[in-house]
């Protein structure tokens, strides 16, 4: 137990027989609860019937467009099937379009439509507020620490 305060019990240290395992102390359980809180706040504040994954794809595409679907998936931490479904829905809604890749006309790339750009503009302030509200129980220092720790394990 080098450099560890002995009064702090490790989060996941079940006994071999499992009798000290408590799901509410497990990282997966806590991350799921935090995500549920975030999704509920997001749904209540964001407009345009956007999901968290659609918003992630739109806002990242704004930064990196034009982009292949695979690149957008990597940039938003979505697997191939998930990003395909998200992009298909965004295309169907007229927020994203495909175009010939200017570097290789045989490939298609994704770009925001004017409506996609407008959707981002209408919702960007709400997105910032969603993050602030999600993290509202934390101090500024705790927010920074949480974000750094999450980046470290991702």
Give residue spans per PLM region:
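Generic alpha-helical hydrophobic packing signal
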Residues: 26, 53, 57-66, 70-73, ...
């Amino acid at each position: 137990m080098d450099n560890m305060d002995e009064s702090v019990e490790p989060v996941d240290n079940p006994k071999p027989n499992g009798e000290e395992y408590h799901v509410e102390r497990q990282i997966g359980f806590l991350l799921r609860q935090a995500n549920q809180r975030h999704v509920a706040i997001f749904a209540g504040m964001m407009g345009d019937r956007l999901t968290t994954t659609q918003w992630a794809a739109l806002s990242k595409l704004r930064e990196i467009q034009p982009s292949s679907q695979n690149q957008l998936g990597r940039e938003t931490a979505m697997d191939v099937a998930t990003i395909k479904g998200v992009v298909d829905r965004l295309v169907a809604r007229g927020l994203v379009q495909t175009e010939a890749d200017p570097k290789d006309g045989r490939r298609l790339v994704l770009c925001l439509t004017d409506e996609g750009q407008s959707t981002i503009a209408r919702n960007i302030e709400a997105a910032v507020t969603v993050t602030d509200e999600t993290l509202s129980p934390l101090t500024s220092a705790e927010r920074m620490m949480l974000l750094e720790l999450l980046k470290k394990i991702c």
